């Protein structure tokens, strides 16, 4: 919601959002086939659409310029940069980059430090908020949050299920 607030009014009394009139684009981690099934950020309709579920809804949202979702090849900073160059101008604006540091629902693939550093620097240069999803990678890091080991400073961190460190009563 915070990312969409830069594009759409919350209510009639709100000020004009900075990117009103542009189509928000969400960048998420791709699966090996270039699809969106590797990213998982929850079970809300929005996060399910980010993952490629509800394809009819996703197609309609894109067709009507409400928002667009594009997958980024795993650990491919050049692909990320290409998408930013293509989708962060004119009628489009990259609304956010959402990713796990370890794709736990896709074989526990770890993002490289180089990929994270380069993509996060591009995001900073282009006013693109970053959400690091630590839902399943929390607590087993000596730094509590794995993003600290990557020396990155995301705008948003999703935390939760991993806090018990795999120990459940």
Features from the language model and the residues they span:
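Short acidic, glycine/serine/threonine-rich loops at helix termini
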Residues: 1, 37-43, 107-109, 140-145, ...
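PLP-dependent aspartate aminotransferase-fold enzymes
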Residues: 1-96
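Proline-centered loop/turn at the N-terminus of a beta-strand
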Residues: 25, 127-129, 155
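Conserved residues at the C-terminal ends of beta-strands
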Residues: 29, 100, 160
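Conserved PLP phosphate-binding loop immediately N-terminal to the Schiff-base lysine helix
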Residues: 100-112, 128-150
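Surface-exposed amphipathic alpha-helices with a cationic face
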Residues: 116-124
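Active-site PLP attachment segment
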Residues: 151-169
């Amino acid at each position: 919601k915070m990312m969409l607030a830069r594009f759409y009014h919350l209510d009639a009394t709100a000020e004009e959002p900075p990117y009103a009139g542009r189509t928000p684009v969400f960048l998420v981690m791709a699966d090996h086939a270039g699809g969106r099934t590797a990213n998982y950020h929850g079970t809300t309709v929005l996060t399910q659409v980010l993952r490629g579920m509800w394809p009819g809804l996703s197609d309609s949202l894109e067709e009507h310029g409400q928002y667009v979702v594009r997958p980024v090849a795993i650990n491919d900073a050049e692909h990320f940069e290409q998408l930013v160059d293509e989708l962060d101008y004119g009628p489009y604006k990259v609304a956010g980059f959402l990713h796990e540091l370890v794709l736990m629902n896709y074989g526990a693939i770890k993002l490289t430090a180089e990929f994270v550093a380069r993509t996060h620097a591009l995001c900073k240069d282009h006013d693109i908020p970053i959400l690091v999803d630590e839902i399943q990678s929390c607590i087993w890091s000596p730094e509590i949050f794995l993003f600290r080991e990557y020396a990155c400073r995301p705008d948003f961190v999703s935390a939760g299920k991993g806090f018990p460190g795999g120990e459940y009563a």
